[in-house]
């Protein structure tokens, strides 16, 4: 019997970010390859982090190219289902919406995998108040967490929702070292240098800790952005007088990134705009205690006082207090790290994600 054919219209790396990485995992998923004939169209018009949010001729060319590739695939194939990972607000939504409508025009079933949030900020504005209901009507919508549902509840009914948490590959079958032996505790921030990820909040917290005489080194890893270049970051560090406590290492990948995860003591992600950060799952895999914020679906990942601390968003004082508590209590760091590792193994492996996404596709063709 011929396998059902599925069309995946998703952003693929580069650039490397959460949604693109999940799409890449889906593209490589053996369970899907065994059950279905899978076609992919790259929805991303950016090829590096610097291009995100900027207009260029090449981005228009890529958009038009992706649209006509999608049109050709819909004409020449009979798809049992179209899976789309789209932006739900702003110009990104206006760019992605035509792909959903094209699939609907051909009478195909549609699943939308929602990796972002922000619909509530534009749902009452033109043209979104007309377009959003059109795009999401008669679709199934995959959310990463029920905590994200309030953002889309004006447009999407609860009956349309399917919950599927993200998962990441397991780097090693061996258990990580739960106890680190650094003479000076090492903190790790791993994200692109974007203000909404809490870069300045963490720098301010570092200043508070340094002024108190706390001993630590805060390691920043991630690519530069248009808002925060290396020069801007280093100036911010100098202005706060924390040059001896903060190091920017630039972006790191593969073994280079792993070496930081295996050697630091505390992972910090003071974000103000996230859905379900993969970087937190990475930290849990390496048994790191986490300090983060209650944004998006993070409460499903980090349980306060169990595998980390949840702090108030954009509050350097609260962040500094949480860091100071873990700096002073090595046993608590180990305990939180062990709890996080067990939670990761139970819920957030790529193997579990692949099983979930494959079953969702099967149930909806």
What annotation goes with each model-predicted range?
Residues 289-292, 302:
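Short hydrophobic beta-strand element within catalytic cores of glycosyltransferases
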Residues 7-9, 178-197, 202-206, 218-224:
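Conserved donor-binding/catalytic core segment of Leloir-type glycosyltransferases
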Residues 231-252:
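Nucleotide-activated donor-binding/catalytic signature segment of Leloir-type glycosyltransferases, i.e.
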Residues 272:
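Aromatic "clamp/platform" in nucleotide-sugar-dependent glycosyltransferases that forms part
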Residues 318, 325, 332-346, 353-359:
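A short, well-ordered alpha-helix in the C-terminal region of glycosyltransferases
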Residues 304-305, 309-316, 325-331:
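Conserved acidic donor-binding segment of nucleotide-sugar-dependent glycosyltransferases
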Residues 132-174:
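Donor nucleotide-sugar binding/catalytic pocket of nucleotide-sugar-dependent glycosyltransferases
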Residues 42-46, 190, 217-231, 250-251:
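Glycosyltransferase donor-sugar binding loop
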């Amino acid at each position: 019997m011929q396998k059902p054919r599925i069309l995946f219209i998703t952003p693929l790396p580069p650039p490397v970010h959460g949604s693109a990485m999940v799409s890449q995992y889906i593209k490589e998923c053996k369970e899907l390859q065994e059950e279905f004939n899978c076609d992919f169209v790259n929805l991303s018009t950016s090829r590096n982090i610097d291009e995100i949010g900027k207009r260029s001729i090449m981005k228009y060319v890529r958009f038009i190219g992706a649209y006509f590739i999608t049109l050709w695939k819909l004409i020449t194939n009979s798809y049992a289902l179209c899976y789309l990972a789209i932006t739900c607000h702003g110009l990104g939504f206006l760019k992605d919406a035509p792909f959903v409508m094209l699939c609907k025009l051909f009478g195909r079933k549609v699943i939308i995998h929602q990796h972002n949030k922000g619909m509530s900020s534009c749902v009452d504005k033109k043209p979104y108040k007309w377009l959003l209901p059109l795009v999401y009507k008669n679709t199934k919508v995959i959310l990463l967490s029920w905590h994200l549902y309030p953002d889309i509840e004006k447009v999407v009914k609860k009956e349309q929702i399917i919950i599927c948490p993200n998962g990441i590959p397991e780097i090693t079958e061996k258990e990580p070292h739960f106890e680190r032996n650094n003479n000076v505790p090492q903190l790790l921030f791993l994200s692109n240098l974007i203000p909404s990820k809490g870069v300045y909040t963490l720098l301010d917290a570092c200043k508070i800790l340094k002024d108190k005489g706390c001993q630590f080194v805060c390691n920043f890893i991630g690519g530069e952005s248009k808002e925060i270049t290396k020069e801007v970051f280093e100036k911010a560090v100098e202005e706060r007088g924390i040059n001896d406590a903060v190091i920017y290492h630039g972006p790191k990948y593969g073994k280079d990134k792993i070496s930081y995860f295996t050697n630091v003591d505390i992972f910090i992600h003071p974000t103000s705009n996230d859905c379900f950060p993969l970087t937190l799952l990475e930290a849990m895999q390496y048994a790191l205690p986490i300090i983060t914020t209650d944004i998006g679906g993070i409460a499903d990942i980090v349980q306060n006082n169990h595998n980390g601390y949840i702090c108030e968003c954009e509050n350097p004082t609260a962040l500094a207090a949480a860091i100071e508590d873990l700096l002073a209590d090595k046993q608590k760091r180990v305990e939180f790290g062990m709890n996080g590792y067990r939670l990761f193994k139970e819920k957030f492996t790529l193997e579990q994600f692949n099983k979930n996404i494959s079953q969702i596709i099967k149930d909806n063709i």
